[in-house]
């Protein structure tokens, strides 16, 4: 059967196990390589595609229709985006079952137009369920996405593995960025690719936020006299970030409150003597349950991580379990028993996702206020 492609060109996805999937191209024509991962989120593709944690990855969205509500115009509060997670699309490529035209009053462009304008290839009209089943059974693998081109020698694009690249070099700012607050309390965000949703939640609590590069010197961080420090999310293998890990250790000597989120949770774990390992296919969804051990309450949370603390034995010394995932037992947060450090593997800010656990930021604010 002849494949009809509404954008006029075909596309392909090559997986490192030799699987070749043919579909229709959309967005920009081009060839890109990346780690193939999937999200089960049913909405929030503008936020997902701009999440720096997806840098270096080809994202497969399991929901069958993607693009229905288009792409909105960027909106900001004190320089912080309120409807995107960064200034640009971060994924290497996008794979969907069906790319649809938008029908919503505030759409400024279609998904196709957005990817086209930012040079990102897309692939549609493929069986995303079969891709997800393969990734779920075999584990994440490298792949090559081609839109408007055939992949003649895919292996040449796969010479370097995702786990071997420090992607924070592409997602961390080159110089400090300040977002003014109204409480007089200044916090520093160590920005390895932080989501604007995290910045927004911090700004809503009145903080003046100083975003510093991922590998910013600790003495320069302390020049801002921060009342607290946040290590936010970001892409890639945390075990490669030895400079960031050492900076975290050095910061603990000042005994100021620290909040680690996602990659920040992993950096904190490694810095304090715990272990972080690669997961088979990770958690990428907006409906993952976590249990708060202190209250025995279950919350529905947003996740985007391919590494984690896989068991209680991997927790750092002098830490106590805070959150655990009831599905697979992975550690979703811990609290240090001697230092003012709290961490979550999940995203308390959501974006996209439920706001069940935004109170984590309130807990951090109380820690900062006590320190002030």
From Swiss-Prot:
Glutamine amidotransferase type-1 domain location: 186-372
Family membership: Belongs to the CarA family.
Quaternary structure (record): Composed of two chains; the small (or glutamine) chain promotes the hydrolysis of glutamine to ammonia, which is used by the large (or ammonia) chain to synthesize carbamoyl phosphate. Tetramer of heterodimers (alpha,beta)4.
Swiss-Prot/TrEMBL catalytic activity: hydrogencarbonate + L-glutamine + 2 ATP + H2O = carbamoyl phosphate + L-glutamate + 2 ADP + phosphate + 2 H(+)
EC numbers for this chain: 6.3.5.5
Binding of L-glutamine, residues: 53, 234, 236, 263, 266, 304, 306-307
Protein's job: Small subunit of the glutamine-dependent carbamoyl phosphate synthetase (CPSase). CPSase catalyzes the formation of carbamoyl phosphate from the ammonia moiety of glutamine, carbonate, and phosphate donated by ATP, constituting the first step of 2 biosynthetic pathways, one leading to arginine and/or urea and the other to pyrimidine nucleotides. The small subunit (glutamine amidotransferase) binds and cleaves glutamine to supply the large subunit with the substrate ammonia.
Gene Ontology terms, MF aspect: ATP binding; carbamoyl-phosphate synthase (glutamine-hydrolyzing) activity; glutaminase activity
Bilayer-crossing regions: none
Organism taxonomic ancestry: Archaea, Thermoproteota, Thermoprotei, Sulfolobales, Sulfolobaceae
GO annotation, biological process: 'de novo' pyrimidine nucleobase biosynthetic process; 'de novo' UMP biosynthetic process; glutamine metabolic process; L-arginine biosynthetic process
Superkingdom of this protein's organism: Archaea
Protein's name in the database: Carbamoyl phosphate synthase small chain
Sequence segments annotated as region (CPSase): 1-182
Active site: 262 (nucleophile), 347, 349
Gene3D superfamilies, sorted: 3.40.50.880, Carbamoyl-phosphate synthase small subunit, N-terminal domain (3.50.30.20)
Keywords associated with the record: Amino-acid biosynthesis, Arginine biosynthesis, ATP-binding, Glutamine amidotransferase, Ligase, Nucleotide-binding, Pyrimidine biosynthesis
Name of the encoding gene: carA
Pathway in which the depicted protein is active: Amino-acid biosynthesis; L-arginine biosynthesis; carbamoyl phosphate from bicarbonate: step 1/1; Pyrimidine metabolism; UMP biosynthesis via de novo pathway; (S)-dihydroorotate from bicarbonate: step 1/3
HAMAP family according to UniProt: CPSase_S_chain (MF_01209)
